[in-house]
């Protein structure tokens, strides 16, 4: 499939052939598994000391004393110990470090999931169904010249995004930033932020600095491209801007 390459003014300058990876069948099941595997591998195993609450010298005084037959502190028989309902006792069902919390996925399945997520960025219906505003976007996938990689000023990237028709989607991401409900707002996750366009480049020559302050915009090189960036929240079809060099590098890696 041939697509147009746009300059930074939003004008088509040439046509190129897309790599075969954009013809990969749509596999939402594998994409979901790959994203969840990526999520779970960021979780740190936690557990409790196996001897917590058990470091007491206790005795069982037996029956006939008018007291519950639970373990008692040897030097203070009035106070229970060891049992979960006692002060300083063990926990009932503490978390264990042995618990398997990581979801794994085979290497070939993960590679196929990335390829399928890449192909989903070229599906207009999937991009629109994900919530992106693409009314003014000239084409999906949007391919631009390599000069985009050298833009390092936020004001310049803003004008480029407007000329390429993706600024409406960035405004949508800005308006959908909300304060998180619950205690997560106290733990470094105060805001729930919507995802806007993804910029994939062959080489970072300043574009990361120029685009990082725009709400919802992510910049990544082809080598670091992952399924979580292509399908945030397990939902494929993210609006993606590719540079011409990124398309060529994609052809070398995935064919």
From Swiss-Prot:
InterPro entries: Ribosomal_uL4, Ribosomal_uL4_dom_sf, Ribosomal_uL4_euk/arc_CS, Ribosomal_uL4_euk/arch, Ribosomall_uL4-arc. It holds the Pfam family Ribosomal_L4. Keywords: Ribonucleoprotein, Ribosomal protein, RNA-binding, rRNA-binding. GO terms for biological process: translation. It comes from the Archaea. GO terms for molecular function: rRNA binding; structural constituent of ribosome. GO terms for cellular component: ribonucleoprotein complex; ribosome. NCBIfam families: rpl4p_arch (TIGR03672). Part of the 50S ribosomal subunit. Belongs to the universal ribosomal protein uL4 family. This is Large ribosomal subunit protein uL4. It comes from Thermococcus onnurineus (strain NA1).
